[in-house]
From Swiss-Prot:
One of its GO terms (cellular component) is sodium:potassium-exchanging ATPase complex. This is Sodium/potassium-transporting ATPase subunit beta-1. It is a single-pass type II membrane protein. The gene is ATP1B1. Glutathionylated. N-glycosylated. It comes from the Eukaryota. The modification Phosphotyrosine is found at residue 101. It is found in: Cell membrane; Apical cell membrane; Cell membrane, Sarcolemma. Residues 191-303 are annotated as: immunoglobulin-like. The modification Phosphoserine is found at residue 11. One of its GO terms (molecular function) is ATPase activator activity. Glycans are attached at residues 158, 193, 265. The C-terminal lobe folds into an immunoglobulin-like domain and mediates cell adhesion properties.
Amino acid sequence: MARGKAKEEGSWKKFIWNSEKKEFLGRTGGSWFKILLFYVIFYGCLAGIFIGTIQVMLLTISEFKPTYQDRVAPPGLTQIPQIQKTEISFRPNDPKSYEEYVRNIVRFLEKYKDSAQKDEMIFEDCGNMPSEIKERGEFNNERGERKVCRFKLEWLGNCSGINDETYGYRDGKPCVLIKLNRVLGFKPKPPKNESLEAYPVMKYSPYVLPVQCTGKRDEDKDRIGNVEYFGLGGYPGFPLQYYPYYGKLLQPKYLQPLLAVQFTNLTMDTEIRIECKAYGENIGYSEKDRFQGRFDVKIEVKS
């Protein structure tokens, strides 16, 4: 039995290294070299084919604009202050209750300060009234970075923070800033004037994508009170000269036009659900995405 075990042990040792034939694991050095060379060439060819395929694919893709945008959803509408539960609840006589909302607005508006828009090589004045879409050439690097329209805080009126650093929260008249999310190459198409007849409070311009905030439910409509809008030229919406957006590579300092909304006499101690909605021929809404073209926010001013 001991002899059989020794014989078995000697056989696997001989398989690992056969000193008589100079073989390692059943192959000579030359055989190992040939098989390793084969696999190096084989996997090298596979890697070359893969890299070549990627290079060909990259030649068809622009780093400045997606080749296909037919499935890109319409832009979303969002509010500032940006809050997790889309609920704003505060007491006007308690600064700590609205401190986070004010800080959120201040932080967002930093890039809209005059001091941040001084560079004449980057920023330009695009007028104090809404105007037509401002084309800035093709989506490529032939002309380098594109200029960006300035947006002045003073256009936000009572919600600019210039005269009221609490943005109305101290007086129980909260401000909410509204922006249309960036979509590369998107050109808003405002609705026709006659299609807005159901919304008589909306000031119309063919060069503005209008926005309106109303009570979400019937009971909310009676409690929302007066709503004031502050935007470029006094229009409640987004002026077209700020579009299209050319992307971070061509417009790294791009400023979205803003609309400020102030609720001046909300019913106290009542949770009011408010819906703000953009209107346009190429603005869509989705039940699956509550921010596509609109948003809801709950506001409660406590006594």
